[in-house]
Design a protein with these regions (language model features):
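Terminal leader/tail segments of proteins
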Residues: 1-91
Length: 91
């Protein structure tokens, strides 16, 4: 799959993976750039953490993945993203 197809799979609750495995989606609602969770499905919809140079930088590739995912989900601060992840863990 290409990146756009993986993002589409994620936003539709399906699993997907790029050929090199750098971007993966899971049926548990997570989107990963390498091993870093960059997107989740919350009760209010999908969100993406701002792991970019304007937020909490991780890598160039991850920044690109965040940008791709922002086409289907809003970007939130990494702090807000971590709070949402914690809330999901309690469900």
């Amino acid at each position: 799959m290409n990146k756009s197809q993986v993002i589409s799979a994620w936003s539709n609750g399906r699993s997907g993976r790029t050929a090199n495995g750098s971007l993966t989606s899971s049926t548990d609602g997570t989107l990963r750039s390498y091993n870093l969770v960059i997107g989740i499905h919350t009760a209010n919809g999908f969100i993406v953490g701002d792991f970019t140079s304007s937020g909490t930088y991780y890598s160039n590739t991850t920044s690109t993945h965040v940008g791709n995912a922002s086409q289907v989900a809003p970007i939130v601060s990494v702090d807000d993203f971590k709070v949402a992840q914690t809330e999901l863990a309690w469900l």
